[in-house]
C-alpha cells in the first residue's frame, strides 16, 4: 500500500505542475500575460481540488504507517487492496463537490474595474481583490473550507503519529 500511495502522490504532483506550469511558461515566453475568466476559474478549481486531495492522501498515508507500525500482524487484513483503493479514491473525489461549489461561488461575484491580477496563477486572494461587491461571506466560506480540509487531516495525522510514538 505504501508504494501505491507514493504513486498517487507522484500523480498528484504531475497534476499540480500540469495545472499551473503550462500557462506560466506561455506567459513568460510570449510576454502576453492574459487568461480568460473561464480558464482562470478552471485553473483555480483544479488547484483547490488537488490541494484537498493532497491533504486527504497525507492523512491516509499516516493511517497506513500507523497500521504498519502499531499492528503489523493485522496490517495485511486491515489495509488490503480493496480498502487501500477505497481510501485513495475517497481522497481523490472527496473534495471535488466542495471545491467546485467554492469556485462557482467565487466566480459568481460581480467583477468591475480592473481585471488584472498580480499573481503567477489564478488564486483566491487576487480574485477577491478584483470583485467590486462585498466578499466577506465568500472569504468566511473559504476560510471555513480551508480549516476543515487542512485541520481535519492534520489532526488525523497528529493522532496517527502520536499513537506511533
Segments from the language model and where they lie:
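Transmembrane helical core of 7TM receptor-like proteins
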Residues: 1-165
